[in-house]
Amino acid sequence: MRPERVSDEATGSPAPDDTDPVNPFDPLDPFAPVTLPWTTPSPPAVPTAPTAPTAPAASDDGRGRIEGFASASAVAPGDSIDFHVTVDPPRPFRVTVHRIGHYDGRGAAEIVTSPRLDGTAQLPPLTAGRTVSCHHWWLSWRLPVPSYWSAGAYVAVLATEDGRHQAHVPFTVRDDRASDLLLVLPDLTWQAYNPYPAADGRAGASLAPADDEHEAADPVTTVTFDRPYAGDGLPPQAGHAYDVIRWAERYGYDLGYATAGDLHAGRVAPARHRGLVFPGRDEYWTDEMRTAVEDARERGTSLVFLAARTLYRRIEPAPAPSGSDRLLTCGRRRGRPGPALWRENDRAEQQLLGIQYAGPVPRPRPLIVRNAGHWLWEATGAHEGDALDGLVAGGADRYYPRTPLPAHDERILLAHSPYGDRQGARRHQETSLYRAPSGAWVFASGTLAWSPALDRPGHADPRIQRATANLFDRICKRD
C-alpha cells in the first residue's frame, strides 16, 4: 500500500505539529517518571496502624530542600567527580551512589556512601538572559572513582540525614576497553530538556520549544551543565536508557559505556566496538558526534537507534568558567520558532538513520509488523500485520521518499504503523534497517516506546525483547 502523502513530502522538513511530543513533567506520559529501587516506598517491617508508606520527598526547585549537580557527566575510573549541593534549610546529608543494572531484578546496586556531610544553603542561581547557572556553588563532596569500578550508568542519591528529602545526580563511568556494544547515554539531550529552575517543567531554562510561555519573546539559546536537573534531579528521559541497560546486562551482553559528550569530545573510539547503541531519546547532536558516528559506520561499526526523534536538532558545546563543554548552544530555526534542525542544513537525519522524525503521537498506537519473515522478527512469534499494542508512542519516525537515503547494500522497513496526529490527519510510523557498504547494520526503531518494551514494568513486550536480541546477536556475531 502506498504511504499517504503529507504536505511536507517534497522537502522532508518537520511535520506541521512540531512541538515536543511529551512534556517531560506530564504525569500522563506513559514512560515517566523514572522508578528506581530507592524511590519505591517499602511497608514497615513491624505491623502498625494501616497508614500508607511514604518515600522521601523529592527536591522542589521553588523551595530548595536538597538538590545538586556534578562537575562532569562522565568520568573514567581513577578520576574523581565533584558534587555541588544545596540544602535549604541547612541540615546534614549523605550521598549514596548506585549503579544501574539488572542485579537479579533489583534494577540497581548500592556501591558507596559518603560520610556525614554538612549541608549548606548555596547562593541563588546566576542568570545571564535566560541562561541559569550554579557554577558558583561551593564543593560539597569529592568522589574518587576507584580503578576497579565497573563502567556503567550511576546515580548519586542526595538524602538529608533526617530522611525527609532526597534528590538525584546522574553520571556515567566510562572505560577505554573495546567491547561488543558501546552504550552512548544522551547527556546532551537530557540537559537540553532540563527546565531548571522550573519545578513544573514549564517556562524554565530549557532549549525545548514546547510549553515555554516566553519562547516567542525571549527564547533560550544556551543552557549549562552547572545546575541541577529539575524536579527530583533525574532526567525523565533517563528511564529509556536504564531500561536498555537492565535488559542488556541481564542477558550478558558485553557493554561499554560513554555519553554523547564523550563522543563529541573524542574521549571514546567508536570503531573499537562492534556496535554503538543509542538507548534513549537522543535529539541534540553536535557536528563532531555525527562525524564520529558516520566514520565508525564506514569502518564497519553497526549503529542501533532505539528511539525516535534522534539527530533532530543541532547543538554546539562551549566552554564555561567551570570547564570545557559545560555550555550548550543551539541556533534558532529559519523563519520559525524553535532550535535549529539538521534537515534545514542539507544534512537530514535520514541520511544516517534511514528514516527521520515525523511528529508527535498523541495517544499510544500499535506497531504493525511488516516483512515478518526477516531475521529481526525470527522467533518473536510476530506475523505479518500483527499489531503490537502501545509500541508507537510519544513520537514517530518514518521514511521520506524525497529525502536522500544513505548508501546501502540492503534496506528494509520492518513496521508500518498508522496513527492520527493532533489535527486528526493520517500519519504513519516506520522501523528501518539497512546494511552499509562497509557491512555495518544501521537500525532505527522509529518510536519512543521501543526501549521501555525491553524492561519497563507494565510495558515490557517479549516480541520486542526477542527482536532486539536478534539484532544485538547479529551485530555481536553470536551463533
Walk through the language-model features, giving the residues of each.
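Aromatic-Pro/Gly-enriched surface loop or interdomain linker
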Residues: P90-H102, A108-P115, G163-A269
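Active-site rim elements
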Residues: D232-P235, P337-W342, A348, S451-D461
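An acidic, glycine-rich "communication" segment
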Residues: L311-G424
